[in-house]
Amino acid sequence: MNWLTNVVRPKIRNILRRETPENLWIKCPDTGQLVFYKDVEQNQFVIPGSNYHMRMGAVARLRAIFDNETWYDVALPEVVADPLKFRDERKYADRIKDARTKTGAHDAVRVGFGKLETSPVVVAVQDFDFMGGSLGMAAGEAIIRGMELAVEKHAPFIMFAASGGARMQEGILSLMQMPRTTVAVQMLREAKLPYIVVLTNPTTGGVTASYAMLGDIHIAEPGALIGFAGARVIEQTIREKLPDGFQRAEYLKEHGMVDMVVHRHDLRPTLARLCRLLTKSPALTVTTAVEAPAEAAAKAEPEATTTEQPVAPAPTEPPAQPAAPQA
């Protein structure tokens, strides 16, 4: 009987049991309500009702920004994976391996080149799911390569920052990326190219002491945590209670640290408008002409109808194939 109850019956139950995905529902951190994950995903990871902005992966960011959800993944320089042979509770190499398996990304920063409302742009995205979006050698090289490509293509550079700071497992090599990325920003300025930074939740630590706060325009998502040190550390240092909302996007806007707070649904048109403004490109216009009856009849004839649409030239340098939309 033990064989029947302990072996056969559990196997039958496993066969008949309906599999339920672990991420079928998602809980809003603000209100606690349970929301269907697909609804949140289709809403650009904004909780319906509460408008709470969830963290957004690099691929989802790029899909939301580029025309037709298509872009070129920029080939990034290879770096030494574990230069210090660092180990705490686990080997750093094992942590990197797990993060790559979890996110499908090589490191915390992904760079894409494509069109934003028909204008070429270079976009770099930090993925907080990859070791907290920490800034290491690979991330620093990715950001610098993205800025170099922007100069080569004479295109605006857009940076989506989301990080807990420098990657401690790489020590001084990680901290060295702060001045290196700062020098790369100066390269954009000398080329007179727009550098727009989108500060997402959270943007803290060393990135706020380098490239994340050096943009021509700083945009923050609603409710984003932005700052160098944590609020508790500051309170213990100055021995004072911090005001409500300290280090949040809205507080920083009121005190002049960011230029605007933009809802995620409005981010793409806002970025496109800023790029056109800063590059002095003509605005997109939609015109409706009233045609004479004779002209309308002539255009109705198949042999007289011509449909000409501008064809964007294919990028010449960025490598590999266009990144296909990912579910």
Swiss-Prot record:
One of its GO terms (cellular component) is acetate CoA-transferase complex. Pathway: Lipid metabolism; malonyl-CoA biosynthesis; malonyl-CoA from acetyl-CoA: step 1/1. This is Acetyl-coenzyme A carboxylase carboxyl transferase subunit beta. The gene is accD. It is found in: Cytoplasm. InterPro entries: AcCoA_carboxyl_beta (IPR034733), Acetyl_CoA_COase_Trfase_b_su (IPR000438), ClpP/crotonase-like_dom_sf (IPR029045), COA_CT_N (IPR011762). The keyword Ion transport does not apply. Acetyl-CoA carboxylase is a heterohexamer composed of biotin carboxyl carrier protein (AccB), biotin carboxylase (AccC) and two subunits each of ACCase subunit alpha (AccA) and ACCase subunit beta (AccD). It holds the Pfam family Carboxyl_trans. It comes from Rhodopseudomonas palustris (strain TIE-1). Transmembrane segments: none annotated. The keyword Cytoplasm applies. Keywords: ATP-binding, Cytoplasm, Fatty acid biosynthesis, Fatty acid metabolism, Lipid biosynthesis, Lipid metabolism, Nucleotide-binding, Transferase.
